[in-house]
């Protein structure tokens, strides 16, 4: 699977992810880009789950962002509505972590939209390791959001066999 981690702190929101694509117990690719900028570089998004499914969701989410003038929450809710009513979407196995200058959201495979506590998002197979590391760093250090994401992903990659050390990190200042 993968690890995607997002942290918001001191006027920055950061989403980072590793690059490993696995098929069963085999590493198929080590440098996949699972974190992207969307809607005029104003929205960050990362995915965990099936790669083809995630690209389908990226496309649909980006279309919703365009049709709702970059309003992240509105676009996420509209995508979730589609997800629940469109039979082909209901079979997609992917999670999206999305963030802009105002909100951080998880869009789940069930069509749920969740705004996590403390604007900390961690999804994928290594998500819980990254989340634990990030939470400890948020509570006990003054590190900026980017450094917390870097360290959280590194720790997850050291522990989770489905997460590697090839990271893509995007930063949005606000």
From Swiss-Prot:
Keywords in alphabetical order: Allosteric enzyme, Cytoplasm, Hydrolase, Metal-binding, Protease, Sodium, Threonine protease
Enzyme Commission number(s): 3.4.25.2
Keyword Lyase carried by entry: no
Xref: SUPFAM superfamilies: N-terminal nucleophile aminohydrolases (Ntn hydrolases) (SSF56235)
Signal peptide limits: none
GO cellular component: HslUV protease complex; proteasome core complex
UniProt GO molecular function: metal ion binding; threonine-type endopeptidase activity
Substrates-to-products reaction catalysed: ATP-dependent cleavage of peptide bonds with broad specificity
Description of activity control: Allosterically activated by HslU binding.
UniProt-annotated location(s): Cytoplasm
GO biological process: proteolysis involved in protein catabolic process
Domain of life: Bacteria
Subunit structure as annotated in this protein's UniProt entry: A double ring-shaped homohexamer of HslV is capped on each side by a ring-shaped HslU homohexamer. The assembly of the HslU/HslV complex is dependent on binding of ATP.
Family the entry assigns: Belongs to the peptidase T1B family. HslV subfamily.
Protein name per the record: ATP-dependent protease subunit HslV
Species, as recorded: Cellvibrio japonicus (strain Ueda107) (Pseudomonas fluorescens subsp. cellulosa)
Gene: hslV
């Amino acid at each position: 699977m993968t690890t995607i981690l997002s942290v918001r702190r001191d006027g920055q929101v950061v989403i980072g992810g590793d690059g490993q694509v696995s098929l069963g117990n085999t590493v198929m690719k080590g440098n996949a880009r699972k974190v992207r900028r969307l809607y005029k570089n104003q929205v960050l998004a990362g995915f965990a789950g099936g790669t083809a499914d995630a690209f389908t969701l990226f496309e649909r989410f980006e279309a919703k962002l365009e049709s709702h003038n970059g309003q992240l929450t509105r676009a996420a809710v509209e995508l979730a509505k589609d997800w629940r009513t469109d039979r082909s979407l209901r079979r997609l196995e992917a999670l999206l972590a999305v963030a802009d200058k105002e909100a951080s959201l998880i869009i789940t495979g069930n069509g749920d939209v969740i705004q996590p506590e403390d604007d900390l998002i961690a999804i994928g197979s290594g998500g819980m390791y990254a989340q634990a590391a990030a939470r400890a760093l948020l509570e006990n250090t003054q590190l900026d959001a980017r450094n917390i994401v870097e360290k959280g992903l590194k720790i997850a990659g050291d522990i989770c066999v489905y997460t590697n050390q090839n990271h893509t990190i995007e930063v949005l200042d606000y």
